[in-house]
Swiss-Prot record:
This is GMP synthase [glutamine-hydrolyzing]. It comes from Marinomonas sp. (strain MWYL1). Residues 208-400 form the GMPS ATP-PPase domain. Homodimer. The active site is at 86 (nucleophile), 181, 183.
Amino acid sequence: MSQDIHAHKILILDFGSQYTQLIARRVREIGVYCEVRAFDMEDQDVIDFDPKGIILAGGPESVPEPGSPRAPEAVFTLGVPVFGICYGMQTMAEQLGGKVQGSEIREFGYAQIRKHEGPALFDDIQDHIANNGVALLDVWMSHGDKVITMPEDFTLMASTDSCPIAAMANEAKKFYGVQFHPEVTHTLQGGRILSRFIVDICGCDTLWTPANIAQDAIERMQEQVGDKKVLLALSGGVDSSVVAALLHKAIGDQLTCVFVDNGLLRLHEGDQVMKMFADNMGVKVIRVDAEDLFLGKLANEADPEKKRKIIGNTFIDVFDTEATKLTDVEFLAQGTIYPDVIESAASKTGKAHVIKSHHNVGGLPEDMQFKLVEPLRELFKDEVRKLGLELGLPYDMVYRHPFPGPGLGVRILGEVKKEYADILRRADAIFIEELRNAGWYEKTSQAFAVFLPVKSVGVVGDGRRYEYVVALRAVETIDFMTARWAHLPYELLEKVSGRIINEIEHISRVTYDVSSKPPATIEWE
């Protein structure tokens, strides 16, 4: 076995903050493994986790309120460095004998804190030097309560006019607390502060790299699977593509992929998947042409939720049929990633951050008699992409925009027909091609075309015609929870519109969606 890339790890306790996963991603980017757990983790579990350091994340609760969340006592007795962020700093202060109270002035957004000399966490880290010689840090605040009395043996690290104790430290025990959020980009020195804590103070080695992750995953898959066979539903999306590349490298011909072409994919996507995996990489891929089956089941159905269920259930039926044809398959591979694992790890008190989980591989039936292989379950999406590059997958495949599970089925409003899908495929391909040519594909988070089954008047030569409408959608977002419409140049939109109308029959009008999320969703259905 190669070196243990989990040997040096950080424990992050979640108190319900929207930023908790962002903290974890920042720690991973530094090159150190970490896990997110609910704040009510048992003391023995904290001890058994054996962290090199602990981060107490933020949260929406109020420390002075009865019954508000507290960190396990083992956090402060284990003898490892502890870093409290926002709520994490407040509960640290309260639990160690300090005092927290509600503030008359709530701080949300940009703030500038005055640094006090001494503690190692901020040593030689600042954004500006004031005229009076005081070092200043530009940070992002989001809090109502504040620490008014520090615990014994703590010293002041930073302050603002409205928050006299903006950061505190117990250097002997290596306990640190900050009232701001170092994990967000608005805190300009946040990365350096986190790195100072994790690498310098906790003493973690930076073992968590794409090359090490790939080698570790390959060895773990070989150990788990042995000489048995593995089945994977290959969709062409990022997660399943990386799983396919990883397992092929680990177990070779023991892997069989089933690629279901449902007739709702992007232009030439089926051929591209086969060329990449079957032809170039030598992966064993069974391609199932199920377009007629899917479109037949979708006939006369206009309700978006019913369309989703039909597409999902039909996929399960097709995959199940193919699976039963294969003999001696013991394992089913899935592209579960770390956010899926976090989302289902609900705290027993219900106060930790819980988002609805989603099922991989279309929600395969529970009665399938396979053992699960989930090689990506420790990784965030950005780590999956980096792993894909490490495994030799092309950049354009690994960093392509998200595509919904039901495919074009939810980008054709109302009933799905082959004619509509063929028109939409071509319009979408033109849009994406021109975005790439203009250098805008990487600037947008998601871009696609939508088919509207309504007819609008157009003029061709001396004649009028009634043809269909296509809408273009492009958004910019960090987390897909909120998004703003992309302000594409008019010249680019004009070129895309002209090509779609001139090159594709039965389109008379192209529109651009200028709705942000909320209130609109990113997809139209």
